[in-house]
């Protein structure tokens, strides 16, 4: 097999070395010419795999190490008989850790009690569903909007988007980017909906940039709208809007799901799909390539405040403010410089583990055990 992989996909050799020749390119450089002699294509979300790129090529399998598939022309894949796989849920836990870090930063700035907020989660798939589990596990009030899932689960606890936007203090977006169809999500939060948000609302977008109308959001924030905003995704990536970023409490370069586990899990999942497509046995597993966690065990004082414990456990693993600082330093120079910096921050992102690898002792206090279990950390 002739394999072409995005150079930023990790451990490709570990999984695919015995499957043929492997060539690597920057994801944004993968085009029609690059696919002239390729059987297997491995990409991330930065590569648009379209009819124009694939027509006439020998590509027979496409794997994307991402949850989303809006960069894949699935209609053409079906027409051309091209097998494909995404990596559903691969980085979901990393995104949840990111959102928790954003909420802690917002609460610190606002002097708010996270337990007293009402949370609205838009999109309850792999990421949003896990976030809902964590928030409800903490005992917090959560509203969920997911029309496609509601259609499949008519007895589920879902609300309309209008009700969620009207009642939630915190809105976290986790939808795919659908430009058409029954449930389009491009500019789901458009100017009228953004303008109607309650004063003091917190907004987190770690899904796709175009789910929020970035220009409308910037105009509102420049006009003094009382919102706290955390954006990890941007319209026109890798060209993020510096003026919009300046008005965000947290601004990062599409790294919410960049945990080490998430990255390696994504490669493992497309390898599994590739093996199934070829009808061959898997010879490598995720556990073969995943380093043992370096997170230290933590001992919580049984008398500590559960809210303090929550913040301490989350920040012991990840605090998005460090990524925010690095991103803001990159938002200088001309457009080409900023685009290159956006990709460089993602390419050279430091290893980050997930909260699920944290081992925590609580001295037997039930309230602290609830926090640990809700976060998905390990009780010892």
From Swiss-Prot:
<dbReference type="GO" id="GO:0036001">
    <property type="term" value="P:'de novo' pyridoxal 5'-phosphate biosynthetic process"/>
</dbReference>
<keyword id="KW-0664">Pyridoxine biosynthesis</keyword>
<comment type="similarity">
    <text>Belongs to the D-isomer specific 2-hydroxyacid dehydrogenase family. PdxB subfamily.</text>
</comment>
<dbReference type="Pfam" id="PF11890">
    <property type="entry name" value="DUF3410"/>
</dbReference>
<comment type="subunit">
    <text>Homodimer.</text>
</comment>
<dbReference type="Pfam" id="PF00389">
    <property type="entry name" value="2-Hacid_dh"/>
</dbReference>
<dbReference type="InterPro" id="IPR006140">
    <property type="entry name" value="D-isomer_DH_NAD-bd"/>
</dbReference>
<dbReference type="InterPro" id="IPR006139">
    <property type="entry name" value="D-isomer_2_OHA_DH_cat_dom"/>
</dbReference>
<feature type="active site">
    <location>
        <position position="208"/>
    </location>
</feature>
<keyword id="KW-0520">NAD</keyword>
<feature type="binding site">
    <location>
        <begin position="206"/>
        <end position="208"/>
    </location>
    <ligand>
        <name>NAD(+)</name>
    </ligand>
</feature>
<feature type="binding site">
    <location>
        <position position="258"/>
    </location>
    <ligand>
        <name>substrate</name>
    </ligand>
</feature>
<dbReference type="GO" id="GO:0033711">
    <property type="term" value="F:4-phosphoerythronate dehydrogenase activity"/>
</dbReference>
<keyword id="KW-0560">Oxidoreductase</keyword>
<feature type="binding site">
    <location>
        <position position="232"/>
    </location>
    <ligand>
        <name>NAD(+)</name>
    </ligand>
</feature>
<dbReference type="GO" id="GO:0046983">
    <property type="term" value="F:protein dimerization activity"/>
</dbReference>
<feature type="binding site">
    <location>
        <position position="146"/>
    </location>
    <ligand>
        <name>NAD(+)</name>
    </ligand>
</feature>
<dbReference type="Pfam" id="PF02826">
    <property type="entry name" value="2-Hacid_dh_C"/>
</dbReference>
<comment type="pathway">
    <text>Cofactor biosynthesis; pyridoxine 5'-phosphate biosynthesis; pyridoxine 5'-phosphate from D-erythrose 4-phosphate: step 2/5.</text>
</comment>
<comment type="function">
    <text>Catalyzes the oxidation of erythronate-4-phosphate to 3-hydroxy-2-oxo-4-phosphonooxybutanoate.</text>
</comment>
<dbReference type="InterPro" id="IPR038251">
    <property type="entry name" value="PdxB_dimer_sf"/>
</dbReference>
<feature type="active site" description="Proton donor">
    <location>
        <position position="254"/>
    </location>
</feature>
<feature type="active site">
    <location>
        <position position="237"/>
    </location>
</feature>
<dbReference type="InterPro" id="IPR036291">
    <property type="entry name" value="NAD(P)-bd_dom_sf"/>
</dbReference>
<dbReference type="GO" id="GO:0008615">
    <property type="term" value="P:pyridoxine biosynthetic process"/>
</dbReference>
<dbReference type="InterPro" id="IPR029753">
    <property type="entry name" value="D-isomer_DH_CS"/>
</dbReference>
<dbReference type="GO" id="GO:0051287">
    <property type="term" value="F:NAD binding"/>
</dbReference>
<feature type="binding site">
    <location>
        <position position="175"/>
    </location>
    <ligand>
        <name>NAD(+)</name>
    </ligand>
</feature>
<protein>
    <recommendedName>
        <fullName>Erythronate-4-phosphate dehydrogenase</fullName>
        <ecNumber>1.1.1.290</ecNumber>
    </recommendedName>
</protein>
<feature type="binding site">
    <location>
        <position position="45"/>
    </location>
    <ligand>
        <name>substrate</name>
    </ligand>
</feature>
<dbReference type="GO" id="GO:0005829">
    <property type="term" value="C:cytosol"/>
</dbReference>
<dbReference type="InterPro" id="IPR024531">
    <property type="entry name" value="Erythronate-4-P_DHase_dimer"/>
</dbReference>
<feature type="binding site">
    <location>
        <position position="257"/>
    </location>
    <ligand>
        <name>NAD(+)</name>
    </ligand>
</feature>
<keyword id="KW-0963">Cytoplasm</keyword>
<feature type="binding site">
    <location>
        <begin position="126"/>
        <end position="127"/>
    </location>
    <ligand>
        <name>NAD(+)</name>
    </ligand>
</feature>
<feature type="binding site">
    <location>
        <position position="66"/>
    </location>
    <ligand>
        <name>substrate</name>
    </ligand>
</feature>
<dbReference type="InterPro" id="IPR020921">
    <property type="entry name" value="Erythronate-4-P_DHase"/>
</dbReference>
